[in-house]
């Protein structure tokens, strides 16, 4: 395997010059630079990424910690981040916590050892101790969506409260007064805010919130299926259900279908996230849209900005996105 000394010998220059050409850390004459690159190509020399990172104090790599990359919502964000990393010349280390808090420390330790230039966090499992340890490394961090507030990190917020309010308000405007909820974990910030938005819209319309119509699970379709079946055992049913994710809505619609009930004739359903497949549900799902690609790209751009500037002069920022209602065919208008 060729070494930097072999390249220097073939190009007729010093190893220091080869290093400057590779890392672009000093001006090198065009003819000399060409000789070095010709030698690199001829010898099939591959510089050590670790050695280069020590020279230029960058690894051109980003870490991303998320709850799970399998869920459609997260998958769409990861895809956008990965593509933008590629366009900017960065590699991406993807770490899934799978809702297991103990994994967060192992992932953070690994990313520190990999000397990543920055980290995107999109999970709610990390602890204050973990953050303090990570902040001690001075590695820039951007917290996306689900994350807790932190004085050292930028935050990208999806405004789940506003989204929960919009979803419920749409049901009310379509004449629904008996409205239920199938939520994700209400201990999670995202679910809690959507539920608070639901409550605000209900209270403004002077509509009662019936606790027997409030169901809590996770964000998977199996949870939507199970909780809808639990709801259907009740004597009195709501006319509409606000599902806290499109995947929950998928399970809920499936449960209704198995009971011979149709959406929206027998029960209206509104989802949240506007994942790619939601337009192909039967019926196409009315939902709350938040641009996953825009969220991912914005978070990465902020992180890259932090990486490039003096950390002592940077003030963490909070950026909010505003959700939008996407009208399809899963909500019945009872006013007609």
From Swiss-Prot:
Is the main repressor of the genes involved in the de novo synthesis of purine nucleotides, regulating purB, purC, purEK, purF, purHD, purL, purMN and guaBA expression. PurR is allosterically activated to bind its cognate DNA by binding the purine corepressors, hypoxanthine or guanine, thereby effecting transcription repression. Hypoxanthine binds at residues 73, 188, 219, 273. The keyword ATP-binding does not apply. The keyword Thylakoid does not apply. Consists of two structural and functional domains: an N-terminal DNA-binding domain, approximately the first 60 residues, and a larger C-terminal domain, approximately 280 residues, which imparts the function of corepressor binding and oligomerization. One of its GO terms (biological process) is negative regulation of DNA-templated transcription. It comes from Actinobacillus pleuropneumoniae serotype 3 (strain JL03). Keywords: DNA-binding, Purine biosynthesis, Repressor, Transcription, Transcription regulation. Pathway: Purine metabolism; purine nucleotide biosynthesis [regulation]. Residues 2-56 form the HTH lacI-type domain. One of its GO terms (molecular function) is DNA-binding transcription factor activity. This is HTH-type transcriptional repressor PurR. Homodimer. PANTHER family: HTH-TYPE TRANSCRIPTIONAL REPRESSOR PURR-RELATED (PTHR30146:SF148), LACI-RELATED TRANSCRIPTIONAL REPRESSOR (PTHR30146). Residues 4-23, 48-56 bind DNA.
């Amino acid at each position: 395997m060729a070494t930097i000394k072999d390249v220097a010998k073939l190009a007729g220059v010093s190893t220091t010059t080869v290093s400057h050409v590779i890392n672009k850390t000093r001006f090198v004459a065009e003819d000399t630079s060409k000789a070095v690159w010709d030698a690199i190509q001829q010898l099939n020399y591959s510089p050590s990424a670790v050695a280069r990172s020590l020279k230029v104090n960058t690894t051109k790599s980003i870490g991303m910690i998320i709850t799970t990359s399998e869920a459609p919502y997260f998958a769409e964000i990861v895809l956008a981040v990965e593509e933008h990393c590629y366009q900017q010349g960065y590699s991406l280390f993807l770490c899934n916590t799978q809702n297991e808090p103990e994994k967060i420390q192992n992932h953070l330790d690994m990313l520190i050892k990999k000397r990543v230039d920055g980290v995107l966090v999109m999970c709610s499992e990390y602890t204050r101790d973990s953050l303090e340890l990570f902040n001690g490394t001075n590695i820039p961090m951007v917290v996306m969506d689900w994350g807790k507030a932190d004085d050292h990190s930028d935050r990208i917020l999806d405004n789940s409260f506003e989204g929960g309010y919009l979803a419920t308000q749409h049901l009310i405007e379509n004449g629904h007064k008996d409205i239920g909820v199938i939520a994700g974990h209400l201990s999670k910030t995202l679910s809690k805010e959507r539920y608070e938005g639901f409550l605000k819209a209900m209270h403004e319309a002077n509509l009662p919130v019936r606790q027997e119509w409030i169901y809590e699970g996770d964000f998977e379709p199996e949870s939507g299926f199970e909780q809808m079946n639990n709801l259907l055992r009740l004597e009195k049913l709501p006319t509409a259900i606000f599902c806290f994710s499109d995947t929950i809505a998928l399970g809920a619609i499936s449960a209704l279908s198995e009971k011979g009930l149709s959406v929206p004739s027998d029960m209206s359903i509104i989802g949240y996230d506007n994942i790619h497949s939601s337009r192909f549900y039967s019926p196409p799902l009315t939902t709350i849209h938040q641009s996953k690609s825009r969220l991912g790209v914005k978070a990465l751009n902020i992180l890259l900005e932090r990486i490039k500037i003096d950390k002592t002069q940077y003030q963490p920022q909070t950026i909010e996105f505003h959700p939008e209602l996407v009208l399809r065919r899963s909500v019945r208008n009872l006013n007609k």
